[in-house]
Amino acid sequence: MVDDTSAEACAAGLNYLAQVYHDGVQVTYPLYSEEEIAAMPSRAHAELYYCPAEQPGAKFAIVLSGNSLYYSGELRGGVSTAWELHEQGYAVFSLRYRIGWEAGDDAPLEDLARAIRFVMDNADTFGVSTEDYALLGYSSGGQLAGVFGNEEKGWGRYGVPKPGVLLLAYPINNFFEAKPAYHLLMDTDRLERRYYSYTVSKLVTPDYPPTFLWYGRNDLMLKAFVYPLQGPTLAKALEASGVPNRVEVYDNAKHGIGIGVGTDAEDWVERAAEFWQSVSE
């Protein structure tokens, strides 16, 4: 589903992808080999969608859309955001990661690490810089990006370079009552903590990546998960740890609005790109 807050950018992004595909550029990449998929069939659902930059040597971002266990927002969050960042001069990869019952044993973190490694290993093919890459996450995708920003739980654990910046749009900081349900759905036979059990603000350390964070005061999803312990708590943790950050809070910016056209969050992607540039200098 694509609503009015993302429709125009989504259409522009799809048209651009169709054009580059027509010009001979591959835009869809599986993340796992046939042998790896045979060993774990759910890996077939992990893919990268590539939106090339106009100029070689551009920095790249990986976009993690939100999901509702059975639906992920590659169109609303992925393609529209890819187009907005493309307009700012970046290369963008929208990640389709495993969700729902396929997301057990930290599968989404594995997918993200595999995506980063794949882009890094093929940087010449994609024409991208390997320095200061961004993770841009919406909602539960923002929670994934936030966990991955921690060295022990994320990038260091998987042996990939540290993100240059996190760009988090209405991220879930703490899943609260949903954690037992997620455990029953995804990891019934496991005792270890998994990605959904972590509170992002508790993973913020002084060496955490610079972070652009925004959320809305009228976000009902964040209110369902105890609003003060979501964005506000994450913002305090960033400040307390001395992490370079920019936090924007809007009166009219509901959950799931993506790039936010027609809301108080409109043009947030441009401001996030400016922040990214400022912390990369």
Which role does the model predict for each range below?
Residues 1-56, 105, 177:
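N-terminal cap/lid segment of alpha/beta-hydrolase-fold proteins
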Residues 46-57, 117, 124-126, 201-205:
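Short beta-strand-to-loop junctions in surface cap/lid or active-site-entrance loops
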Residues 58-67:
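Short beta-strand element of the alpha/beta-hydrolase
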Residues 73-77, 95-130, 260-265:
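Catalytic nucleophile-loop/oxyanion-hole region of alpha/beta-hydrolase
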Residues 75-93:
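Short amphipathic alpha-helix adjacent to the substrate-entry channel of hydrolases
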Residues 114-184, 191-196:
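Primarily recognizes the serine-hydrolase "nucleophile elbow" in alpha/beta-hydrolase
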Residues 158-165, 171-177, 192-232, 236, ...:
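The feature captures the conserved acid-bearing segment of alpha/beta-hydrolase catalytic domains
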Residues 232-235, 239-281:
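C-terminal catalytic histidine-bearing segment of alpha/beta-hydrolase fold enzymes
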